[in-house]
Structure formats: structure tokens, C-alpha cells
């Protein structure tokens, strides 16, 4: 987690520098500082700082991972990484439901937003509980 914390802390510094440069150069224009972009960049710096700080605190509590060693090999991280369901159709349904909800937001159609959100909730529940059904359901 130390590497991830360092990445996000460097991103914070980058976004602060970009925010200052962006604010300076937009202030030189005839319309003055463009506040929407400047605010967005500064808030992005704040969000990356939050994530970097979280990763830094988590890294203190966890043991070193193979990725944290300077002389680590690929083989050091080998092993079981978890369960993957290769035949699941729920991610496709979740993506389709998210697309419907996004279209509803884009065109501001409340009925389409409602249908999309309901479908997202149903597809997310199906994805989470896919293997939590009883044995008679399979």
C-alpha cells in the first residue's frame, strides 16, 4: 500500500501545481479566472490527497506485500487471488442498466432514471448474490 499511497500523494502535488498554473493562465485572459475549472482541479487534488492519506494509514497497519519489496520477483506474488466467475452474465446486465440510467440523466427523463436505477440495483444484487442461492436453485 505504500506504493499506492506514494502515487496518490504525487498526484496531489501534480494537481496542485496544475491548479495554480491553470488559475494563473486563465487569470491572464480577458474574462479573468475560470473558476469552474480551477475549482475542479483543486478539488481533484483534495480527493487524491484523501485517497493517498487513507492508503498511508492502511499501509501502517498491514504487513509488507510482495509488491512493496524492492527486490521482489513476480513469483513472490503467486498464489490464489480469489474466485472469478467466468460465466456470469450479471456484469453485462449491470453495464446495460448503468447505461440506461446514464441516458436518463443525460436527457433528464425522470422515468428513465428511475427504470435505470431500479435495474442497476437489481443487477448489482444479482451480481453480489449470484452464488448465495440455495442448492435447489442451481
Swiss-Prot record:
Known partners and oligomeric status: Associates with subunits I, II and III to form cytochrome c oxidase.
BP-aspect Gene Ontology terms: electron transport chain
Gene: ctaF
This protein's name: Probable cytochrome c oxidase polypeptide 4
Subcellular location per the Swiss-Prot or TrEMBL entry: Cell membrane
Topology within the bilayer: Multi-pass membrane protein
InterPro entries: Cyt_c_oxidase_su4_actinobac (IPR021050)
Coarse class of the protein's main subcellular location: membrane
Protein family according to the UniProt entry: Belongs to the cytochrome c oxidase bacterial subunit CtaF family.
TM helices/strands, residue ranges: 7-27, 35-55, 81-101, 102-122
Catalytic activity reported: 4 Fe(II)-[cytochrome c] + O2 + 8 H(+)(in) = 4 Fe(III)-[cytochrome c] + 2 H2O + 4 H(+)(out)
Species classification: Bacteria, Bacillati, Actinomycetota, Actinomycetes, Mycobacteriales
UniProt organism field: Nocardia farcinica (strain IFM 10152)
UniProt keyword terms in alphabetical order: Cell membrane, Membrane, Translocase, Transmembrane, Transmembrane helix
Amino acid at each position: 500500500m505504500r506504493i499506492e499511497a506514494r502515487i496518490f500523494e504525487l498526484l496531489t502535488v501534480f494537481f496542485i501545481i496544475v491548479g495554480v498554473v491553470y488559475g494563473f493562465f486563465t487569470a491572464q485572459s480577458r474574462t479573468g479566472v475560470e473558476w469552474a475549472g480551477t475549482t475542479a482541479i483543486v478539488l481533484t487534488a483534495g480527493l487524491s490527497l484523501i485517497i493517498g492519506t487513507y492508503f498511508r494509514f492502511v499501509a501502517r497497519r498491514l504487513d509488507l506485500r510482495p509488491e512493496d519489496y524492492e527486490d521482489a520477483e513476480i513469483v513472490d506474488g503467486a498464489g490464489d487471488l480469489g474466485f472469478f466467475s467466468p460465466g456470469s452474465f450479471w456484469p453485462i446486465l449491470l453495464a446495460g442498466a448503468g447505461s440506461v440510467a446514464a441516458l436518463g440523466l443525460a436527457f433528464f427523463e425522470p422515468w428513465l432514471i428511475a427504470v435505470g436505477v431500479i435495474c442497476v440495483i437489481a443487477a448489482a444484487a444479482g451480481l453480489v448474490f449470484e452464488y448465495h442461492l440455495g442448492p435447489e436453485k442451481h
